[in-house]
Each structure stands twice: as C-alpha cells, then as structure tokens.
C-alpha cells in the first residue's frame, strides 16, 4: 500500500507543479512544512498528521487510503478532486477544537478524545472505578464506570459514540464527557463549554490514559490531571 500511495502522491505533485506551484513529498511527520498538507491514508494517519500540522498552523485535507475515512474529505476514487482544492487560495478552512491534556506538568494535544480507562490484568480482579469531575473548580459529577472519555466534536463520532455519547457538529463550542460501561443506566454524557477546564479526582491505583488511541501514561489519586481546550 505504501508503494501505491507513493505513486499517487507523485502524480498529485506533478499536477501541482504543472500549475506553477511547489510540491514536496513527506513520509515522516517531522518533515512536514508548507502552506497546505495533503494526507493519503486512513483516520490514524490523519490524526497524527493533523496534530503535527496544527503546531505549524498548516491546513490539512485527507484522501482515504486506509480502512476508515471518517476524518478524510475524499475517498480513494476521488483523489483528483483534491488538486483544485489545494490550489484554491480562497478555499474555506474549517478549524477543529483540540484538547490539551496536562498530567503532572506534561502536556499532550488530542484531536479526538482523551480516554481514562481502568486497566485489565489477567491476575487481578476487574472492578469499576469511581472518577469525580470538576468543571472550572465546581463539582460536576461522579462517574462509576470502566472509564471516562473526554471528546471533542471531531471525536464525538469515534470512541465516545461507541460508548453511548452524542454526535456533535464540528462547529459546536462544546466538549463531551462520556462514561464507559457506566454502573448506573442513569449515568449519561455531559456536554460542557470548551472554554472550561476539567479537573479529576482519581481513585487509588493507576488508570491508563490514551490520547487518540495512543498511550500517554498512568494516573492515580496522587496525580494532577486537567483537560482544557488547546490554544
């Protein structure tokens, strides 16, 4: 698949060169630069590229060459449609809100979600955990569940949706708290302003933290964990 993607990228680059512009092919995220970024891949590739591009303030458009293409604008058979889009200097750019996760002073950005999950080990009992949440310092609720998801509007169609969360349109000025396999059927998702800051009271023993599916670390009662909108 890498060879197919490379040949497609070379063909797109040739069209861009023919239009009088410069095109550079990248295979590593650390190499990314330029005014527009075209990503050939699935949602995993889009997530990694978008987070890197956001640091550089580069707009991203994706073509689905992977398994899932929720985040990509075009499917494989629509590849050529990306050319006039990236050449149009007046094309609309949709900005997506991201999470900034801070764990004991270390910061991580998430485009989809932060997941706090109870670790499952073959030699230990599997029990639910209790997580208390404060919004801007005020107690907002206590969740008894296998874990908790903090989702952006972009991530509302991913893990959060599978856990029973609501779908939010990309322009919503909200984030969403969704319990994972909640102990009580009355425990539901909470939508809150993305201008607010979340803080957590975590149980004894470590929870596992994942940002967009990537392991971030572990956190427990002695750790300080906050989530806010990334600037």
Describe the residue ranges of each PLM region.
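Short glycine-rich anion-binding loops that position phosphate/pyrophosphate groups of nucleotides
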Residues: 42-45, 68, 154-156
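A generic structural signal for short beta-strands and their flanking turns/coil linkers
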Residues: 95-99, 110-112, 127-131, 146-148, ...
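ATP/nucleoside-binding phosphotransfer catalytic cores, i.e., glycine-rich phosphate-binding loops
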Residues: 108, 116, 122, 135-139, ...
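A residue-level signal for conserved active-site and pocket-lining positions in enzyme catalytic cores
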Residues: 38, 64, 114, 213
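Proline-centered loop/turn at the N-terminus of a beta-strand
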Residues: 57-61
């Amino acid at each position: 698949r890498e060879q197919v993607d490379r040949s497609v990228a070379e063909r797109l680059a040739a069209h861009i060169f023919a239009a009088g512009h410069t095109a550079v092919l990248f295979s590593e995220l650390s190499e990314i630069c330029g005014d527009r970024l075209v990503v050939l891949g699935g949602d995993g590739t889009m997530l990694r590229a978008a987070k890197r591009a956001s640091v550089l303030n580069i707009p991203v458009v994706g073509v689905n060459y992977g398994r899932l293409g929720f985040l990509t604008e075009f499917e494989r058979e629509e590849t050529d449609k990306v050319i006039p889009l990236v050449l149009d200097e007046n094309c609309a750019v949709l900005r997506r809100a991201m999470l900034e996760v801070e764990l004991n002073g270390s910061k991580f950005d998430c485009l989809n979600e932060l997941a706090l999950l109870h670790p499952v080990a073959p030699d230990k009992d599997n029990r639910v955990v209790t997580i208390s949440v404060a919004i801007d310092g005020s107690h907002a609720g206590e969740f008894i569940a296998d874990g908790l998801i903090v989702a952006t509007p972009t991530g509302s169609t991913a893990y959060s949706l599978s856990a029973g969360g609501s779908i939010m349109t990309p322009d919503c000025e909200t984030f969403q708290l969704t319990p994972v396999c909640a102990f009580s059927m009355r425990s539901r998702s909470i939508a809150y302003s993305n201008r607010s800051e979340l803080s957590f009271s975590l149980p004894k023993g470590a929870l596992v933290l994942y940002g967009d599916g990537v392991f971030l670390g572990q956190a427990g009662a002695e750790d300080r964990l906050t989530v806010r909108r990334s600037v």
